[in-house]
Amino acid sequence: MLPYSACIVKHFLPSRLYIFAQTLPFPRVLPYNRHMEFKYFKNMLVISGVKPFDLEKCCTCGQAFRWVKNPVHMQAGLFGECGLNDAEASPAFTGVIRGRAVLVMQSDDSLIVTPCAKGEAQLFIDYFDLKRDYSAVEAALAADERLRVCLPGSSGIRVFNQEPFEALISFIISANNN
């Protein structure tokens, strides 16, 4: 039986690349992040324990085109309300998740999503694929010499669980991007 990732690429990659994908050292069952916690503050959701995660890399890597980088002053004060450190904050991004406009910010290993009502955490955890333990996936990729060189520049990127139409349009745009 092929590893999970090889089964996915089987339908999308040319035969030579598919043969290479079969040799990748991905785990058969992708591990889950057991260190993640979330809390609500007013109309904000704070998700902590989401390493490795780099919001800026995720939103600008070309997998989604509905994310806009905001000036740093827009997030001033929000981190203090949640008990987080402004100094470790990355830029904030405005985007659309399942038809909802949201502002997302990161401080160290915490992610802040606003606006968010109580009970909506699962929507954002699923979209950003925060349940998956990407450090275990990166460790499996590091076992391959060819992929090890790519890890420093791509560490922290997570695959967004976009709506199918959004993923299709993002793929078409990135394929036609010069």
Question: Where are the language model's segments positioned?
Answer:
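Short terminal hydrophobic/aromatic SLiMs and anchors at protein ends
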Residues: M1-F20, L24, Y32-H35
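HhH-family (HhH-GPD) DNA N-glycosylase catalytic core used in base-excision repair
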Residues: I19, V29-N178
